[in-house]
Amino acid sequence: MTQNLGISVPMMSSSPLFANAPPEKKGVKNFAIDFLMGGVSAAVSKTAAAPIERVKLLIQNQDEMIKAGRLSEPYKGIGDCFGRTIKDEGFGSLWRGNTANVIRYFPTQALNFAFKDYFKRMFNFKKDKDGYWKWFGGNLASGGAAGASSLFFVYSLDYGRTRLANDAKASKGGGDRQFNGLVDVYRKTLKSDGIAGLYRGFNISCVGIIVYRGLYFGLYDSLKPVLLTGTLQVCSFASFALGWLITNGAGLASYPIDTVRRRMMMTSGEAVKYKSSLDAFQQIPAKEGAKSLFKGAGANILRAIAGAGVLSGYDQLQILFFGKKYGSGGA
């Protein structure tokens, strides 16, 4: 079963921490083909889901945009956000920030491959030999360490994607955009905040990886023996359905972490910033209500469905034309 263990803690948004790493016996040529085809898969699925992804980010971060004077009034929902974005910025604007998101796949997968074996050897516990809790703890530790290590190198791309996606035409200032592209995001952030501006929210993102993995594996191991019994044990659809429900359940439970990290990103270059992720966790619910931590969660679920649907169709095309399915590009 495919495991979506990404940082869009959505974070957690959708990059498997150990996905698409080639088996040790696979040659360099085959790895290169898998790597590139996985990149095509990632580009296809991410580009198809990009409009929903941008709407999710706009709804999630709208309160920071209002504070900065870049949004005149809150969005009333997914449909309202789609309509206003297309009306104010044009249909093509729904893909704003997607290029950075697609580019992020390649270094993420290369880094995952580089780190995965090292951390798996370091926390190499077996469930049947060492017991469930050692295996569970080792899984969290290895996944968290590998995810954080990879994230350190690609976080600025995630930051850039977030700022571009939330760069709606200003409600004040004649409809001007704040950034002209990814390079401009880096240039202005470094000028105003230095390197720290590119990594705002990084610490809570690392926590999010561990929380998501803990919820995912904890729920799966608890529910599988209870729900998948009898004929359901060999039913692939039942296994997929359980995995899908748990993936979305873990993603929804850890969604506030994604909201906090992205809203911290949005304060780079602004006069008022959160002192820390804990300060953000306290301020946001206190001023806006607890539900503000879940803004955009509905769009996030739709994004996952759209991405998975397109990816499934693309996988079938690969089998039809190449006789096999390459890496699924989940990063």
Curated annotation (Swiss-Prot):
Solcar repeat segments: 29-122, 134-226, 238-320
Instruction: Kindly state a single biological-process term from the GO annotations of this entry.
Output: mitochondrial ADP transmembrane transport
The residues listed in the UniProt record as binding ADP, with positions renumbered to this chain, are 104, 116, 261
Task: Report how it sits in the membrane.
Answer: Multi-pass membrane protein
Name of one Pfam family that matches? Mito_carr
**Sequence motif: Nucleotide carrier signature motif, positions:** 261-266
Q: Where is this region: Important for transport activity?
A: 261-266
Q: Where does the sequence pass through the membrane?
A: 31-58, 99-123, 132-152, 202-223, 237-257, 297-317
> InterPro entries per the record?
ADT_euk_type, Mit_carrier, Mitochondrial_sb/sol_carrier, Mt_carrier_dom_sf
Anything known on activity regulation?
A: The matrix-open state (m-state) is inhibited by the membrane-permeable bongkrekic acid (BKA). The cytoplasmic-open state (c-state) is inhibited by the membrane-impermeable toxic inhibitor carboxyatractyloside (CATR).
Q: Which reaction does it catalyse?
A: ADP(in) + ATP(out) = ADP(out) + ATP(in)
GO CC annotations on file: mitochondrial inner membrane
List keywords of the entry alphabetically: Antiport, Membrane, Mitochondrion, Mitochondrion inner membrane, Repeat, Transit peptide, Transmembrane, Transmembrane helix, Transport
- Main location as per UniProt: mitochondrion
Q: Domain remarks in the entry?
A: The transmembrane helices are not perpendicular to the plane of the membrane, but cross the membrane at an angle. At least 2 of the odd-numbered transmembrane helices exhibit a sharp kink, due to the presence of a conserved proline residue.
Q: How does it assemble?
A: Monomer.
| Family to which this protein belongs | Belongs to the mitochondrial carrier (TC 2.A.29) family.
Q: What does this protein do?
A: ADP:ATP antiporter that mediates import of ADP into the mitochondrial matrix for ATP synthesis, and export of ATP out to fuel the cell. Cycles between the cytoplasmic-open state (c-state) and the matrix-open state (m-state): operates by the alternating access mechanism with a single substrate-binding site intermittently exposed to either the cytosolic (c-state) or matrix (m-state) side of the inner mitochondrial membrane.
Please state what the protein is called. ADP,ATP carrier protein 2, mitochondrial
Q: Which organism is it from?
A: Triticum aestivum (Wheat)
